UniProtKB/Swiss-Prot annotation:
Its EC number is 6.3.4.20. Binds 1 zinc ion per subunit. Pfam families: QueC. NCBIfam families: 7-cyano-7-deazaguanine synthase QueC, PRK11106.1. ATP binds at F8, S9, G10, G11, Q12, D13, S14, T15, T16, C17, L18. Gene3D superfamilies: HUPs. GO terms for molecular function: ATP binding; ligase activity, forming carbon-nitrogen bonds; zinc ion binding. This is 7-cyano-7-deazaguanine synthase. It comes from Klebsiella pneumoniae subsp. pneumoniae (strain ATCC 700721 / MGH 78578).
Length: 233
């Protein structure tokens, strides 16, 4: 039996990964992390989507210690979430230091216990928003360390790594779930479901990608299929 574990936040990217994983694996588990994030609604959204889409198990892990250590606008109410700034340089204050290091490592422990062959994460270098822990180089390095530490090669799959947001929308549409991803996921840094607040960086990346996809569905879909190797419809 092919078994995978999805690092699942209930946002656009991880939900798209879950939708695809359910088509490619016999059994899919989801792991969501409670790290005292600013908007706890994302945990509820993740629970609802994991159940609705048919994950065989959904584990919510308490890692609130991260909140004490990692100062970010996503972990502190007194640090405002910045509006979208397309020309901004450096690491944004929405970056939570160590988050993906911790999430992937703990998910690997869970995957080891349930005998999963793969961990799937929605990190993306194309639209990585300045987050160093979304880079391909980082994921490969951590995979190497985890494989050594567990003496087991659990694959780290990153299906969105080289897709832009328009192509990520195309991937959701390829699997027939564009409307669900648009209406029922929570990507917004201000905690608003669906199309979100429209002001933060996450909402702007998401909206711009959707508009680009809807403006040229055939072309974007073709590029996505070429990048991912998915069959033409």
């Amino acid at each position: 039996m092919k078994r995978a574990v999805v690092v699942f936040s209930g946002g656009q990217d991880s939900t798209t990964c879950l939708v695809q994983a359910l088509q490619q694996y016999d059994e899919v588990h989801c792991v969501t992390f409670d790290y005292g994030q600013r908007h706890r609604a994302e945990i509820d959204v993740a629970r609802e989507l994991a159940l609705k889409l048919g994950a065989v198990a959904h584990k919510v892990l308490d890692v609130t210690l991260l909140n004490e250590l990692a100062v970010s606008s996503l972990t502190r109410d007194n640090i405002p979430v910045p509006d979208y700034q397309p020309d901004a340089e450096g690491i944004p204050n929405t970056f939570v230091p160590g988050r993906n290091i911790l999430f992937l490592t703990l998910t690997a422990i869970y995957a080891y216990q349930v005998k999963a062959e793969a961990i799937i994460t929605g990190v993306c270098e194309t639209d990585f928003s300045g987050y160093p822990d979304c880079r391909d180089e980082f994921v490969k390095a951590l995979h190497h360390a985890v494989s050594l530490g567990m003496a087991k090669d659990i694959r780290f799959e990153t299906p969105l790594m080289w897709l832009n947001k328009a192509e990520t929308w195309a991937l959701a549409d390829y699997w027939g779930q564009l409307d669900l991803v648009r209406r029922e996921t929570l990507t917004c840094y201000n905690g608003i479901k669906g199309d979100g607040c429209g002001q933060c960086a996450a909402c702007n990346l998401r909206a711009n990608g959707l508009n680009q996809y809807l403006a040229d569905k055939v072309g974007v879909m073709a590029v996505m299929q070429q990048k991912t190797g998915l069959a033409q419809a």
